C-alpha cells in the first residue's frame, strides 16, 4: 500500500555488504561477503532485531534466524556506479549515477607531490595510507623539527594534510588544502576529499584539534536531498553525511563520535517533531573493523548496533519509515584492506506496513527515488520507487 510517511529515518551501516555483486570480478572482489564471513568467523551473529526485520530472508546469515515471518520489507540493492567508495555509494543512494570513479591511491604520484611542495614551499613526508594517530606518532616530531607537511591517505578517495598549528598557521594549512582541492578535481587525480588535519601537543601526546576542515567535491547534480530542502522539508544529517554531500541539501548537521554516539543522536531525532529525512551514517564498521580486517571487532559492533534497535522500534510513530542499508562492502576476511563490491541489504520498516519481498533492486538510487516519491518532490533521473510495494 502506498502511503505518505511524515518522517523517514535512513541508516547506512557503512560497509555492511551482503555478498558479491554481479560485477565483483571487475573489482577483484569475487567471493566477498562481508556479513556472511563475519558470521562464519564468529560462529554466528547474535542479532535478534535484524532477524526480526528479515535480514536472513535477504540472504542467510549464520546465527540470524529466518524462522519467524519478518516485520519489515526486505531486499538487496546492486550498485551501478563505477566506484565502490563511500561518496559514490551515498550519492547513488540519493539518485546520482557516477560513471567516472573517484581515485584511491596507495601513494600519491610524484607529480602531485611536487606541485604541493612547490606551492607550499615545504617538503612533504609520509605519502602513504595510515591512521591519523599512527602517522602523528611516526612523523609528528620530524614535522615539528623541519616544517615538512605530513600527507597521508586511507583506503578511501582522500588526501589528508596534517600540520602542527604552532608550526604551520591554520590559514596557511587551509590555503594549501584549497590548492590541493583545486588541482585534484578531475582526472588523473579525481579525489573525493581533501582534509586539513591540524594538531597540537608534543611527541607522545599529540592532540588533533577541532579545526579540521573538509574540502569535498559537491555532487555534480541535484540529489533527492536538494529537492527535499527546496520543498521546505527537514534534512537532518547525523555523522559524516554532511561531509559526504559537502553540505548540499542538508538543513541540520550533527556530528557523531562513534557508532553508539550515532545511535544516541538517532534516538534524539526520533523524539523530535520534524517532517522530512533523518540520514545517519555509522562509520565505525568500515573505519575501525573493515579496513583493519578485524572480523571479531566488526561482529561485536554489529551486535551492539542490533541491541540499540529496540530503542528505535519503541520510538517509531505510525507514520514513520525506517530504512536500513549500506553503501558498499568491506569484507574483513577478503585480501587487502580495500572496500569490496557487494550487494547491500535493504530493510524497510513501518509500524503501519506489511512485510514484502522487495527483491533485487537494480540500483541504490531506488532508495532515493522512494524517499522523493514519499514526499512528492522531483524524482531523481535514476532509480525506481518501491513506495507502492510497501
From Swiss-Prot:
Principal localisation: cytoplasm
Listed name of the protein: Phosphopentomutase
Domain of life: Bacteria
Compartments (UniProt record): Cytoplasm
Gene Ontology CC annotations of this record: cytosol
Any single biological process term in GO: 2-deoxyribose 1-phosphate catabolic process
Alphabetical keyword list: Cytoplasm, Isomerase, Manganese, Metal-binding
Enzyme class: isomerase
Positions annotated to bind Mn(2+) 2: 286, 291, 339
Record's function text: Isomerase that catalyzes the conversion of deoxy-ribose 1-phosphate (dRib-1-P) and ribose 1-phosphate (Rib-1-P) to deoxy-ribose 5-phosphate (dRib-5-P) and ribose 5-phosphate (Rib-5-P), respectively.
Residues binding Mn(2+) 1, per UniProt: 14, 327-328
InterPro entries assigned to the protein according to its UniProt record, in alphabetical order: Alkaline_phosphatase_core_sf (IPR017850), DeoB (IPR010045), Metalloenzyme (IPR006124), Phosphopentomutase_DeoB_cap_sf (IPR024052)
An annotated Gene Ontology molecular function: manganese ion binding
Catalytic activity: 2-deoxy-alpha-D-ribose 1-phosphate = 2-deoxy-D-ribose 5-phosphate; alpha-D-ribose 1-phosphate = D-ribose 5-phosphate
Cofactor(s) this protein requires: Mn(2+)
Cofactor binding note of this UniProt entry: Binds 2 manganese ions.
EC number: 5.4.2.7
CDD domains in UniProt: PPM
Family label: Belongs to the phosphopentomutase family.
Pfam families per the UniProt record, alphabetical: Metalloenzyme (PF01676)
Pathway: Carbohydrate degradation; 2-deoxy-D-ribose 1-phosphate degradation; D-glyceraldehyde 3-phosphate and acetaldehyde from 2-deoxy-alpha-D-ribose 1-phosphate: step 1/2
